[in-house]
Amino acid sequence: AAAQQKETAAAAGGGATVSGYDVGGLYLSGPNAGYRSELPPAQFMEWGKPTVGGHALSWHPLAGKNGNPTPGFRATPYPPRPIAFVPFPGNPHDNNHTPGVLPLSWVNMCEFMCNRLSQCLGDEYSRFDVSTSSRSPAFDLAFTTRVLSVTGMESEPGNNKWYNVDCNPGTGTMIAEFDCPADAWFLEGSSRGDLMPYSILMEIALQTCGVLTTWNKAPLTLARTCDRDNILFRNLDATAKLLRNVDLRGKTIRNESTATGYSMLGEMGVQKFKTKLTIDGGEPFYEVDSSFGWFIPEVFEKQIGLDNGKTTPAWHLIPKNAGPQPVVYALPTEEARIFSKVAGAHSLQRRSAQCGYLDKVSFIANSGMHGKGYAHGHKTVDVKDWFFSCHFWCDAVMPGSLGVESMHQAMELFSVNQGLADGIANPSFEHDRGVTKWKYRGQLTPKNKVLECEVHIKKVERAAGGVTVVADGFLLVDSLRVYSTTDLRIRIVPGAASAAAV
């Protein structure tokens, strides 16, 4: 039977389809460990239970190998995806899997992402095991490989004087790591192989904050104060500074995040952090000051966005802003029209659909809030969008970072459409160093219908052999503005400049 199952998996190319979803990345534990599963839907939906052949499903290819435990699944309305990342071999911090004991390994993080929180952080968190509380992002967005240490926490065991917990959630520094493969999906899909999309930088920086706030018992403050187990964690604001462009292929990225404050406002907890990213023991290359909130779900039943609940059409459709009608390009089918007049355009194009977040884009020159150009992006929301399985496993919501990435995509396409790459040999995009800010006051879930983004160009500067483009932006969900961004930054540089990444 085992041999037959191996042959079936091989013949199927490791793929399986359940209700229209590709779930070919599941792996078998037990005697068939390492072979991708080919299971009929009725068996597949028994997540975590033995199949007819007596093998349990796991979402991680290291499960059950070399004495490794098998992380569990919890069934949700969304199917799991193929595992995108595995730890680099030989790291001594990956051998201990004891819940609540540092370091936290990839096994603990798998449990945090898709199963029982207590199997990552210990029995005190068991009240969240069967809840829909926010988890650490999973699958393609699982950017915390391991947690090495937590220091500097203020605590008094047994004395619940900090909002009903015995440690101060606003203290402590966590060191975590992400092992970034050289062929990561986001590197393979970006316009060049050494360019990590800005959204992924954001996620790598912010995800450790989610682990630290949970380790610091912030969700327990809300759970115990409000007697609620289903609570949601959301980024509210951030100021980020890119200090230098770094080639992160095949690198272990170290995240140092420090909690700088925590307060409760009724049925909401607000947490602040300072984060820096480094590699190879070097100086930081990306720094973020951020704030997050813990909420009860009812807060989002009627979100009010940035404008106190008032909906609005996109900027170019507001009568007072009437002007030339933009030409609309369907993506990706008409993307070639945008790039057709650019020499070396292939080096500017995103290389995979997964790295694109828009299905339409349009531009107006010399327009927008700053009079220097305007881009509008559109996406019809699909309940099968890949990121809903990843973020979060028990609480499906589009990552704010991908909303920001949709603005970056619109900026890139605007820049090409307006000829800003003309005269640059083998042009390519890179991130412009400097400060970018964002604010989130709402969310996009599978229940929503339409995402729109606006990009308002505020600076176009030719210098140092390249072109710098800076813009402000907004994201609308069903005509409600929910995100704002300040100073989105990209550069167009000659192809040879890609060697400057160190």
Can you name each region flagged by the protein language model?
Residues 234-239, 432-438:
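Short, structured beta-strand/loop micro-motifs enriched in basic residues and often containing a Trp
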Residues 253-259, 451-457:
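Short tryptophan-centered beta-strand motifs in secreted/extracellular beta-sheet-rich domains
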